Structure formats: structure tokens, C-alpha cells
């Protein structure tokens, strides 16, 4: 009996260690692919080295992360398609002013739509996977661990933290655009010059807010990279 129990314990230990190995390998592959947001992630979540509940848990977690990454990257592709990175291009705005801002109106509408869609998809993924936990043929303790893990993942999700800042930037951009449409301005030396000092101050304040928000995003990104590099060295 002692020998049988010892063998079972050793098998469980070996399976646990293999689970860690597989998850580390797969997460590294996922991270590498996720950096290229121009195309969907295509990660094989299955691995023959795992069996039983280790296989189920691995595939469950990897599928959750893949769907989150793909939702985020699709959102980034939609921002690029909307030419969001050219919003404050002075030449573009000056040209668009002559067209009653048709391009900028569409740009902001497209970005708002993409943001709403991503927010909805993000919440849907989380709810779907919380429900899927109950379908896994694992013990009650493992289900509770997965529920806690998904809850902690959502709270610590740095991509979503960045998204919440991006929403603030969009709000600021809409305020800036309102000023551009409402008050006369002209282009001078690649700058936007309003005729009245009050509008200059308001526009500049909004622009400074955007710069600060972008700096926050960069800080989070650098922190993420440092944390991941630390994990890979361990």
C-alpha cells in the first residue's frame, strides 16, 4: 500500500511539474504572437504531454487568454483602420476643416464603436469562461481555484487597465474636436492657433491631459515587460 501510494504521489507530482512546463512554454508562445496585433493569435492549446484534469485546466486557461488577446488585438486593428493615430495631425485637420470635418467625424465614430465592441467582448469572454468552469470534470476545490484565478486575472489585467486609459483619451479627443468645430482656428507652423485666448488655454489643457494619459500607458507597458522578463529568468 505504501508503495502504491508513493507511486500515485510521484505521478501526481510529475503531472503537476509537466503542467508548469507546458503552461510556461505555451504562455511564452502566446506572448510572442500577441506582440503582432496585425493578425489573430493561432496557438495550439492542446498538448499530448498532459492528461486528465491537468489537460482540462491547461486548455481552459489558454483558451481564455487567447480569446482575450484576440479581442484586444482586433480592437487595435480597428483603431488602425480608423487612422486613429492621425487624429491630431494638423495638416489632416486643416484639410478636413474644408470638408466640414467629415473624416474626423467618421474617425471618432469608428473609434467609439470599436471601443464599445471591445468592452462588450471583454466582459462576455469573462462571463462565458466563469460559466464554463462548472462544465469541467474537475473537483470542487479546482473549480474554486479557477474562479479565483479568473477574478484575479480580471483585476490585474494590464491590457484592460490600458484600455480604460484609452477611453479617457477618446473622451479628451472628443472635447478637443468640439473646440475645433465650434471656434475659428488656423494652422501655423504645424500648430493649431485659435483666435481667442480662452480656447487656446482649453485646447492646450486637453492636449496636456492626453500626453499625461499616454505617459501612464507607457509606464504600464514598461512595467509589464519588466515583470515578464523577470518571470522568464526564474
Please place each PLM-identified region on the residue numbering:
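Residue-identity detector for glutamine
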Residues: 5, 9-11, 17, 29, ...
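Exposed alpha-helical structural elements
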Residues: 18, 56, 60, 74, ...
Amino acid at each position: 500500500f505504501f508503495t502504491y501510494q508513493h507511486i500515485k504521489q510521484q505521478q501526481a507530482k510529475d503531472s503537476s511539474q509537466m503542467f508548469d512546463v507546458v503552461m510556461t512554454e505555451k504562455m511564452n508562445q502566446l506572448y510572442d504572437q500577441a506582440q503582432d496585433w496585425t493578425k489573430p493569435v493561432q496557438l495550439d492549446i492542446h498538448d499530448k504531454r498532459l492528461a486528465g484534469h491537468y489537460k482540462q485546466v491547461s486548455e481552459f486557461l489558454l483558451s481564455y487568454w487567447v480569446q482575450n488577446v484576440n479581442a484586444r488585438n482586433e480592437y487595435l486593428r480597428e483603431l488602425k483602420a480608423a487612422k486613429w493615430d492621425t487624429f491630431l495631425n494638423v495638416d489632416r485637420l486643416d484639410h478636413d476643416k474644408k470638408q466640414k470635418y467629415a473624416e474626423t467625424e467618421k474617425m471618432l465614430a469608428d473609434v467609439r464603436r470599436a471601443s464599445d465592441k471591445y468592452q462588450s467582448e471583454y466582459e462576455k469572454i469573462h462571463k462565458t469562461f466563469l460559466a464554463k468552469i462548472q462544465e469541467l470534470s474537475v473537483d470542487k476545490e479546482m473549480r474554486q481555484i479557477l474562479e479565483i484565478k479568473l477574478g484575479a486575472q480580471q483585476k490585474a489585467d494590464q491590457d484592460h487597465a490600458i484600455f480604460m486609459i484609452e477611453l479617457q483619451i477618446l473622451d479628451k479627443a472628443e472635447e478637443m474636436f468640439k473646440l475645433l468645430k465650434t471656434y475659428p482656428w488656423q494652422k501655423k507652423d504645424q500648430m493649431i492657433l485659435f483666435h481667442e485666448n480662452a480656447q487656446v488655454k482649453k485646447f492646450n489643457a486637453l492636449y496636456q491631459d492626453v500626453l499625461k494619459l499616454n505617459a501612464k500607458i507607457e509606464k504600464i507597458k514598461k512595467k509589464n515587460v519588466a515583470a515578464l522578463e523577470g518571470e522568464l529568468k526564474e
